[in-house]
Structure formats: C-alpha cells, structure tokens
Amino acid sequence: MKKPYRKISDYAIVGGLSALVMVSIVGCKSNADDKQKEQSSLSQSVQKGAFVILEEQKDKSYKVVEEYPSSRTHIIVRDLQGNERVLSNEEIQKLIKEEEAKIDNGTSKLIQPNTNNGGSNEGSGFGLGSAILGSAAGAILGSYIGNKLFNNPNYQQNAQRTYKSPQAYQRSQNSFSKSAPSASSMGTASKGQSGFFGSSRPTSSPAISSGTRGFNS
C-alpha cells in the first residue's frame, strides 16, 4: 500500500498563499488603525469647542460658511441682510431636540437620500437644526445623537452638503485637523467614524455665549 505524499512544491505554494493572506490582513489592519487615529484625533479637537457661522439662504435654509476650533462653542446666525446674532444655549438645545425627533421618525434631511441630482448646493433645504448637527458644533452639542447618525450613509453625504461650498468644508477639515493632538499624545485611539461625529464623547458641554444683534428669528 502506497503512503500518500505531497510534493515539496505543493507545500511551497500553500505556504506562499498563507504569507500573502497574512500580509494583506496586516496591511488592512494598519490602514484601519491609521484611519481610526486620524478620526479620533479630529474628534478630540472638535470637542474642545467650535466657532460656527451659519448663513441664511434665499430658500430660507442655512449653510455653514465658516467654522474653526475655539475654546468655547459659539453659533452665529447671519440673515439675508447680513445681520448676525449668537444663538443662546436654550435655542440651540431646542433646535437639536427638534432635529432629534425628526431623525427618530425619519424625516430629517440629514438622513434622507440626496435628491439634488444637479449637484448644486442651492435648495438643499437644511434648517437650523440640521445645519448645526452637520457642523463641528453638532459633534459637541449633539454628541448623544451620534449613534443615530454616524452609521447612516446618507448622513455622511448630507453633512458635507450643510456647508456653503466645498471650499468651506475643506477649510473646516483643515483647521480642525491642524489643531488635533498628535497620535503620540493620544495614547490608544478609539474607533472613529467619518464626519465630525466620532466615538468619543465630551465629558461636559462647553459653555455657549448668547446675545442678539438684529437677527429676527
């Protein structure tokens, strides 16, 4: 009776395939870890505070025209005439609660498919609540809503559309990335998500200043 045997070349092929699989796994894990560190770093910088300017559009919707890191969170609303005012904490919390209810019942523009096939930012119809939650300030003030948003693919696209232009969005990303702590000072990075909503949650809500300067709400 002949004993079964394998050629040395067979084992070499199997060994080579195993090595390729291991290299692929390690490479994917490394890329995922780098992405997690980047998003966690961005999330941490956002939690410190954000200065956000929302501008009213002709269709009565609102867009983020400027935002950058700040020691305190401020949300300024600018109307069509150029008048500005700082939203009070009470107003912001009310807007966020109203938007959260829309998210829960599926009517929020943030989680609906983008039907604007023309590619223009005009007419997207984001209200104040949607614009706030799509901005950096939303990641701070509405962090508890994050679990309802950051796994939604429509939100990932719509959050960028809350900005007035691609340039405004890119400026925001760059400014928060520059202020983010380095990976060496962060320790182990937690799992991150795209957009401003990350897995980290601020320990306390940043103070928000309030005031009125001629904007009729």
UniProtKB/Swiss-Prot annotation:
Compositionally biased spans, kind Low complexity: 172-185, 199-210
Membrane topology summary: Lipid-anchor
Family, per entry: Belongs to the UPF0323 family.
Name of the molecule in the record: UPF0323 lipoprotein HPP12_0232
One of the record's GO cellular component terms: plasma membrane
InterPro entries assigned: UPF0323
NCBIfam families according to UniProt: PRK04081.1 (NF003146)
UniProt-annotated stretches for the region Disordered: 160-217
Lipid attachment points (S-diacylglycerol cysteine): 28
Keywords: Cell membrane, Lipoprotein, Membrane, Palmitate, Signal
Compositional bias per record (Polar residues), positions renumbered to this chain: 160-171, 186-197
Signal peptide as annotated in the record: 1-27
